[in-house]
Amino acid sequence: MAKKIVGFIKLQIPAGKANPSPPVGPALGQRGLNIMEFCKAFNAQTQGMEPGLPVPVVITAYADKSFTFVMKTPPATVLIKKAAKVDKGSSKPHTDKVGKITRAQAEEIAKTKMPDLTAADLDAAVRTIAGSARSMGITVEGV
């Protein structure tokens, strides 16, 4: 028989930097999960990633105090800001442009995000990434 699920916990944790302090500790502690076990497993799985890159994770908590977790790809906005070499998007996105990325950079981001996007093919994924970039005040060349 399958384990009884008692809840899902969604967090964004920097790669390789999970520790028992907030937000991780309180979120897992409320469900009675082993915080250090999660931190060690998460840090081990994110070892190959760029340190500090925020990684969305969905933790499934079971009635017997065990858990499983699924990591998603980093948010598109973080990848776009990194490619454009800017710290934050524009406060007036359609008026003030804060940076630019090329189509090749948008394709690279789309390939990274492809498992989490609903796009049917790479071209549709590139258009999705380009739309996100435009809404941040970042120009996409060649799209």
Curated annotation (Swiss-Prot):
A GO CC annotation recorded here is:
cytosolic large ribosomal subunit
Which InterPro entries does the record cross-reference, listed alphabetically? Ribosomal_uL11, Ribosomal_uL11_bac-typ, Ribosomal_uL11_C, Ribosomal_uL11_C_sf, Ribosomal_uL11_CS, Ribosomal_uL11_N, Ribosomal_uL11_N_sf
Q: Key word Ligase present in the record?
A: no
Q: Which keywords are on file for this protein? A: Methylation, Ribonucleoprotein, Ribosomal protein, RNA-binding, rRNA-binding
A Gene Ontology biological process in which this protein takes part is: translation
What is the protein's known function? Forms part of the ribosomal stalk which helps the ribosome interact with GTP-bound translation factors.
What NCBIfam families does this protein's entry cite? L11_bact (TIGR01632)
> Which family, according to the similarity comment?
Belongs to the universal ribosomal protein uL11 family.
Q: What is this protein called?
A: Large ribosomal subunit protein uL11
Originating species: Burkholderia mallei (strain ATCC 23344)
